[in-house]
Amino acid sequence: MDIIKGSPVLQVQNINVTYGNFKAVRDVSFDVKAGEIFGLLGPNGAGKTSTLSAVEGLVKYDAGTITIAGFDNRKEPLNARANMGVQLQSTSFQTELKVQEILKLYSGICGVDLNKQRLQQLLADIGLEDSAHKKYGELSGGQQQRVSLAIATIHEPVLIMLDEPTTGLDPQSRRQLWERIEGMREKGHGVLLTTHSMEEAEAVCDRIAIIDHGRVIAIETPEIMIEKHKGDAEVIAASRKGKVTLEDVFIGLTGKALRN
């Protein structure tokens, strides 16, 4: 990975995604920078996963452009894909395989020489230094998700994509996974994650895009978003006699609550 921190690793410009007569993504634009965690925050069905799928090249988009590390993902899909890491679902792996066997398998798929030093570094990055010889099925749900994170970073991509990475985890496992995601930022990766958790968005994201009905409504840091849109949320905050929160802003902009 050789990219300057703060430079864009992903640029999404005016894309539309349509399934039959249903437009799932409508004129969406945003970018993700190296060393940044960017969150797509919205309820189920808002268009988050469809947007990620368009970036990954799994679904066609009707208009607009998507570039990853400068490569157009339609014109140069192989180069774009080589610069992208995707967190796989925990059900993607055989439970009888050992952790190191899974990592070696995917390093081979990615064309990466996973020597002993690199293997130990990957395990250290996800806090599983002592679990190399454990079977995947013996790991907790949070540990399994961390193995998926290691696979996403195994070829040192500039962009890492995480689709609701902590869904189904208990609070402690969620916090542990957030620490690992923040570690990706420190290493200079650009991270694009989707979430319907307000807590997750505020805990790990440098910038947030609120998305609803396939449209991006606002993009800011959590703090600036609260300040800029507090006028839309002051009545909601006053009703519970508290300060304006990001959730108040979300309700003010979309007209609906977002539950974790």
Task: Mark where each language-model region is.
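Conserved ABC ATPase "signature" region
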Residues: 104, 108-131
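Conserved ABC ATPase signature
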Residues: 135-139
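Catalytic Walker B motif of ABC-type/P-loop ATPase nucleotide-binding domains
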Residues: 160-163
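ABC ATPase "signature
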Residues: 219-220
